[in-house]
């Protein structure tokens, strides 16, 4: 949960941890429970925006109302919709390659270094606008699609891409986290489909619920922490971390 939303690639850290400690998840549903915890963290922190989108769509479809706030939220909805498409397409086209990447610590190490350099370069971005446009959404969505690879940070690349597009840091971060919701939900549904044949003992369910709780708490804290860092314009700090971890893991996990 702690690394899920920090721009350090939680999937990359998971692969490296499995290599170092020889770990392996016994049940697919563990990932589903963890995803649920992080999903709820985003849902609660950005509940105002999510409620605004739902209300605006309801008014648009059933009441035919066009308030200024409704127009803004409808625009946000379409931006999120467009931003989700690239990840879906790339995920379907390169599913096998992505799955193979999760077996290679070398790929993770290189991608972490790549992510670190990208995050470092965000210090040179300049704010030009306050909101996310449709073209911005598509480009940020492509960045999210690239983050299917372990070692490529989803939050780092989506927020960083937003910064390079001239979007204010807080707005880029807000859009990034909202954009994570359909991805987390989709990943959970796919994992549930894969694990339909698995039987989960009651005591295991209790442990998974505890895992979901920890994922929620640490996910909540990591989002709050990252938002503070972004407001200070210091996203490149995470870049140093990713580069160091990438180089060390590349050397030590040959």
Where are the regions a protein language model picked out?
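Multi-pass membrane proteins that catalyze or facilitate reactions on polyprenyl-/lipid-phosphate substrates
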Residues: 1-254
């Amino acid at each position: 949960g702690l690394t899920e939303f920090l721009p350090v690639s939680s999937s990359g850290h998971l692969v490296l941890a499995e290599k170092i400690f020889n770990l392996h998840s016994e049940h697919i549903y563990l990932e589903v429970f963890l995803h649920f915890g992080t999903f709820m963290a985003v849902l609660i922190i950005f509940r105002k925006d999510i409620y605004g989108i739902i209300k605006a769509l309801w008014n648009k479809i059933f009441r035919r109302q066009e308030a200024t706030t409704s127009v803004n939220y409808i625009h946000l909805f379409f931006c999120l919709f467009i931003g989700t498409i690239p990840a879906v397409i790339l995920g379907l086209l390169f599913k096998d390659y992505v799955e193979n990447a999760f077996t290679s610590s070398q790929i993770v190490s290189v991608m972490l270094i790549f992510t670190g350099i990208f995050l470092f370069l965000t210090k040179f971005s300049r704010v030009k606008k306050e909101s996310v446009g449709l073209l911005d959404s598509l480009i940020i969505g492509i960045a999210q699609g690239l983050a299917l690879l372990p070692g490529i940070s989803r939050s780092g690349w989506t927020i960083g891409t937003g910064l390079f597009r001239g979007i204010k840091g807080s707005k880029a971060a807000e859009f990034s986290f909202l954009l994570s919701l359909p991805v987390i939900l989709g990943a959970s549904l796919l994992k549930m489909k894969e694990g339909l044949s698995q039987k989960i003992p009651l005591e295991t369910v209790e442990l998974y619920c505890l895992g979901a709780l920890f994922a929620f708490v640490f996910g909540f804290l990591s989002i709050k922490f990252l938002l503070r860092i972004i407001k200070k314009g210091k996203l490149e700090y995470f870049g140093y971390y990713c580069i160091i971890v990438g180089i060390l893991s590349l050397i030590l996990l040959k």
